[in-house]
Amino acid sequence: MAIQHPDIQPAVNHSVQVAIAGAGPVGLMMANYLGQMGIDVLVVEKLDKLIDYPRAIGIDDEALRTMQSVGLVDNVLPHTTPWHAMRFLTPKGRCFADIQPMTDEFGWPRRNAFIQPQVDAVMLEGLSRFPNVRCLFSRELEAFSQQDDEVTVHLKTAEGQREIVKAQWLVACDGGASFVRRTLNVPFEGKTAPNQWIVVDIANDPLSTPHIYLCCDPVRPYVSAALPHAVRRFEFMVMPGETEEQLREPQNMRKLLSKVLPNPDNVELIRQRVYTHNARLAQRFRIDRVLLAGDAAHIMPVWQGQGYNSGMRDAFNLAWKLALVIQGKARDALLDTYQQERRDHAKAMIDLSVTAGNVLAPPKRWQGTLRDGVSWLLNYLPPVKRYFLEMRFKPMPQYYGGALVREGEAKHSPVGKMFIQPKVTLENGDVTLLDNAIGANFAVIGWGCNPLWGMSDEQIQQWRALGTRFIQVVPEVQIHTAQDNHDGVLRVGDTQGRLRSWFAQHNASLVVMRPDRFVAATAIPQTLGKTLNKLASVMTLTRPDADVSVEKVA
């Protein structure tokens, strides 16, 4: 697959607000989000083009919502297969775990297959929308140094020329072997799996069966995955004593493929590559003016398809905070909440991925026998079966501290969780997803009420300066009731009834939603003012809070 990139003019002794090391998916997403916020960004990439072979193959609903936030989801969807099930098979082919979630609470299918190089190309092309963003290929990051108010980055071109970039912030998205992380001596704690796997990608899918299958064969476990555009991926465990060179030999490749294909000679190989599965987590995500994201901060086995998606969560969490700090709307202490919020969830996804790998290829033979026996019980325990079928075991991001205000018991609070994204009806009759009505902004969303009623004039001014949208949700049949309109408030109809159900479940009538779509706080009209003051404080917003009481009585 040939990936094109635009002609790039060199930047010599250039000054930008943010330098991003690495033009992988996390770096490209960071650049797109910051670009639409008007931030001057320079992306530098060691390679001469985007990687053009498939790597990650799973993109989830949260990542698609992130793509939506930068206006690229419509271009990404043609390179995905939605509702992609994952099935674990015994050595005899019996399905003992069928992971097939059909929920779309965040607006998109939960599990999707995709072709990463084509989606990366969409993100790279997306940068062309922003004159304030540039991407330089064939630039090796040789050194960097931090000062009180900037980072100096030293680059080397393919021709050996040196360039210097001065940036307010450096975001390291330079992969698991991150030069930036290693230079800063940040511990990368974890382990490397003893077994390797060989990945074989084939064009014109010779099986064409949908979904992904993980066969728990004790002799040689393997994976068979259907990907978009008629690509088939097989993954086989590399056994002790085998080498990549040996497995790539035609007779050995034929032997591998004969396990899964009736005619292993009639295939169109795209590539074969051996991977080692690592499970590692950086001790720190922020070091003064340097921030680590994606694989530079955490790497995990592929079995739950969460390495790519965890990187997208990093980008979404960090980008809006970095934009606020650069724009002078928040102090840089806000950036400390990035590690506070993201590190624990990244660890949870690492642990889940390791567990899934142990189910596929248990370290001990007896563990595989136990797994196969226990799997029969799933058929007789419907609640447990639904737990796997609906992917409820996936640790959903939930932040217990950071840029949020929590009231009451944390276990049942929606604060720190991603807000739902149902369809809503606009006053002109159009039906759209909620985020499309809000844009890349904060939102104060009220069920049935005027969200401005509980705010002081000073607070309204402060939150409008952040670009906040004020949303009044009403039953769809009330959307054209003119007397309910309020200046500066967008009214939307609850097309599917999901917003009413959400507010009823959580005993709140107002939600403060962050730009990354997480619930920062909940309130009722009489307590909204006090809640916003607390939130402004924990987010270190630069405008002083109004020293007035804004609680109201009816």
From Swiss-Prot:
Function of the molecule: Catalyzes the insertion of one atom of molecular oxygen into position 2 of the phenyl ring of 3-(3-hydroxyphenyl)propionate (3-HPP) and hydroxycinnamic acid (3HCI).
Pfam families: FAD_binding_3
NCBIfam families assigned: PRK06183.1-1 (NF004827), PRK06183.1-3 (NF004829), PRK06183.1-5 (NF004831)
GO molecular function term, any single one: 3-(3-hydroxyphenyl)propionate hydroxylase activity
Family: Belongs to the PheA/TfdB FAD monooxygenase family.
Cofactor list: FAD
Protein name: 3-(3-hydroxy-phenyl)propionate/3-hydroxycinnamic acid hydroxylase
GO biological process: 3-(3-hydroxy)phenylpropionate catabolic process; 3-phenylpropionate catabolic process
UniProt organism field: Escherichia coli O81 (strain ED1a)
Substrates-to-products reaction catalysed: 3-(3-hydroxyphenyl)propanoate + NADH + O2 + H(+) = 3-(2,3-dihydroxyphenyl)propanoate + NAD(+) + H2O; (2E)-3-(3-hydroxyphenyl)prop-2-enoate + NADH + O2 + H(+) = (2E)-3-(2,3-dihydroxyphenyl)prop-2-enoate + NAD(+) + H2O
Enzyme class: oxidoreductase
Gene behind the chain: mhpA
Domain of life from the UniProt record: Bacteria
InterPro entries per record: 3-HPP/3HCI_hydroxylase (IPR023786), FAD-bd (IPR002938), FAD/NAD-bd_sf (IPR036188), PheA/TfdB_FAD_monoxygenase (IPR050631)
Pathway annotation: Aromatic compound metabolism; 3-phenylpropanoate degradation
SUPFAM superfamilies named in the record: FAD/NAD(P)-binding domain (SSF51905)
Keywords: Aromatic hydrocarbons catabolism, FAD, Flavoprotein, NAD, Oxidoreductase
EC number assigned by the record: 1.14.13.127
